[in-house]
Curated annotation (Swiss-Prot):
A GO biological-process term: DNA replication, synthesis of primer
Cofactor binding, note field: Binds 1 zinc ion per monomer. Binds two Mg(2+) per subunit.
Effect on the protein upon substituting F534A: Decreased binding of C-terminal fragment to DnaB, decreased stimulation of DnaB 5'-3' DNA helicase and ATPase activities
Job description of the protein: RNA polymerase that catalyzes the synthesis of short RNA molecules used as primers for DNA polymerase during DNA replication. Stimulates the 5'-3' DNA helicase activity of DnaB.
Organism: Helicobacter pylori (strain ATCC 700392 / 26695)
CHC2-type Zn finger ranges: 37-61
GO annotation, cellular component aspect: cytoplasm; DNA-directed RNA polymerase complex; primosome complex
Binding positions (Mg(2+) 2): D296, D298
Name by which UniProt lists this protein: DNA primase
Subunit-level organization: Monomer. The C-terminal domain DnaB-binding domain exists as a dimer in solution. Interacts with DnaB via its C-terminal domain (residues 415-559 of DnaG); up to 3 DnaG fragments bind to a DnaB hexamer.
Domain of life: Bacteria
């Protein structure tokens, strides 16, 4: 039997929109997603998916449920089959128990009761309360995150409320000595940070001591409820803001999270004293947010940022790294009133790929030609994880970092790596915080292809042999007007007069090939979400992959 805690963890981790959109075409509508119901015939969309709450409901036929129930209904699977299918898809390990089904309601209730005892103790301990306030925490924040304190009086509270001590030992609240088998408080004399599941249930604690010789932070031990390698501190309060802002700030400490929330950055979370791992990714990816790593600039912080960036870059996640130098961290900046400076820094992260390449270069003695050669091989090996377009974007950066001739990297034109900044803002520290310039936008590419066709309409016969108007997302009307020879169309005239569309002799075929490539790359994303039968999806995906391979080898492929 699959443990209930394992089922809960799966439901809390997976994104219901990602699950359902692989079966049904969803469109955003306010805070929800809508579609025509897959469980009954209808013409107008009445099937609603709530990403934040993790459920779907059809206002037409009444079908409703969570991700598991949807997969069961759509694929006609049993409960266990649907669970195992989702776990396999999202790389989540299910735990099985051969014994009787076990409900964790009592465990959650016990931890909530203990958390309440800790909270009461903190407000009866002026010294510890003053410490937190001196660190910049307001009373409202202390209450919102339900901070507490573990003192000897907690023993009395446990006895007085008749809480199950054996259970509390299992849950890591109490320990038992090896010698006399007496119980003791594991978090004695520590400020307590309750740690919640994504569904806002207490699953464990982090404890901070003010004593110098003891370990500064300790967490609850691993249990059926508490897995520090997959939990994120503050996520239960941040998740709605993450979905709305499409951005998540990952920090290193509990206090960083609380102070960031207090300063208005309510999309901040933290790992539980561990590095970011693949086990965190399913939860971190929910809602497809931009991921900002906000780490200390010391050696440990740089190493953690490097390992996380390697993982996130290979996962093709949007976002980047912000390192805080001179022993600063977000908590310090907020406490010092530097909120605007912090906001500016968070607006200009260094992209994951760029950060990795710079760290790789820094790890070699580049005055030594042999070391430089090793660095080049490592950096190019890393770039092989990405598309040819991305590789071409970052090769000039490698040449700059290694002071290597451009032709060594296969670069013919005299180009250099150009970080991109939004036109509305100018960062204070461009040498550290940069967005990498992306490949030409699809809209620009569509304009360029149509401009070539306007300048030389004999190319139109070539073009229509390979493409149709469905290739264009932004300039479909202009292409249709051109095919219908409506050359006085104002939009076509505007393109003809656009001075920002550089044409090169013999360049049309290259741009046409790139436009077709973009089309098939979109198909790879859209086909799995279509309503086609599984066998047809596989055929279409295979065709798209073959086309992409030929296009990258320089062939033109008809759509």
């Amino acid at each position: 039997m699959i443990l209930k805690s394992s089922i809960d963890r799966l439901l809390q981790t997976i994104d219901i929109v990602e699950v359902i959109s692989s079966y049904v075409n969803l469109r955003k509508s306010g805070s929800s997603y809508m579609a025509c119901c897959p469980f009954h015939e209808e013409r107008s969309a009445s099937f609603s998916v709530n990403q934040i709450k993790g459920f779907y409901h059809c206002f037409g036929c009444g079908a409703s449920g969570d991700s598991i129930k949807f997969v069961m209904a759509f694929e006609k699977l049993s409960f266990v089959e649907a669970l195992e299918k989702l776990a396999h898809r999202f790389n989540i390990v299910l735990e099985y128990d051969k014994g009787v089904y076990y409900d964790h309601k009592e465990d959650y209730h016990l931890l909530e009761m203990v958390s309440s005892l800790y909270q009461e103790e903190l407000f009866n301990a002026p010294f510890f309360l003053n410490y937190l306030q001196k660190r910049g925490l307001s009373l409202e924040s202390i209450k919102a995150f339900k901070l507490g304190l573990c003192t000897n009086r907690i023993d009395y509270g446990i006895e007085n409320k008749g809480l199950n001590k054996d259970k509390l030992i299992e849950l890591g609240v109490l320990g038992k000595s090896d010698n006399d088998q007496k119980t003791y408080l594991r978090f004695l004399d520590r400020i307590m940070f309750p740690i919640y599941s994504p569904s806002a249930q207490v699953v464990g604690f982090g404890g901070r001591t003010l004593k110098e010789k003891a370990a500064k932070y300790i967490n609850s031990p691993q249990s059926k409820l508490f897995d520090k390698s997959s939990l994120l501190y503050g996520y239960h309060l941040a998740k709605e803001h993450i979905y709305k802002q499409k951005q998540v700030i990952v920090t290193e400490g509990y206090l960083d999270v609380i102070l960031l929330h207090q300063a208005g950055f309510k999309n901040a979370i933290a790992t539980l004293g561990t590095a970011l791992t693949p086990s965190h990714l399913p939860l971190l990816k929910k809602g497809d947010p931009e991921i900002l790593l906000s780490y200390d600039g010391d050696k440990a912080g740089r190493n953690a940022a490097y390992k996380a960036s390697l993982m996130l870059a290979k996962e093709q996640r949007r976002g980047g790294v912000i390192l805080f130098e001179n022993n600063l961290d977000p908590a310090d900046m907020i406490a010092n009133g530097q909120i605007e400076t912090l906001k500016n820094w968070l607006s200009h992260p260094m992209a994951f790929i760029e950060f990795v390449l710079r760290r790789m270069a820094d790890s070699y003695l580049l005055d030594d030609p042999l070391e430089k050669d090793k660095a080049l091989k490592e950096m190019l090996g890393f770039l092989k994880n990405f598309s040819l377009l991305l590789q071409s974007e970052y090769k000039p950066l490698i040449a700059t970092l290694l002071q290597a001739p451009l032709h060594v990297l296969g670069i013919r034109e005299r180009v250099s790596f150009q970080p991109f900044y939004p036109k509305t803002e100018k960062p204070n520290r461009p040498q550290r915080f940069a967005h990498v310039s992306s490949a030409p936008s699809l809209e620009f590419l569509e304009k360029l292809v149509i401009r070539y066709l306007l300048e030389d309409r004999s190319l139109l016969d070539l073009a229509v042999g390979y493409i149709h108007s469905g290739v264009f997302l932004h300039k479909k009307q202009e292409f249709d007007a051109l095919c219908q020879e409506k050359l006085d169309d104002p939009k076509l005239v505007a393109l003809l007069l656009d001075a920002n569309l550089p044409l090169k002799k013999g360049g049309f075929e290259k741009e046409l090939r790139l436009l077709i490539l973009r089309y098939f790359e979109r198909q790879l994303k859209e086909i799995p979400k279509s309503s086609l039968p599984f066998s047809e999806k596989m055929i279409c995906l295979k065709k798209a992959r073959q086309a992409i391979m030929k296009l990258k080898q320089g062939e033109l492929v008809a759509i």
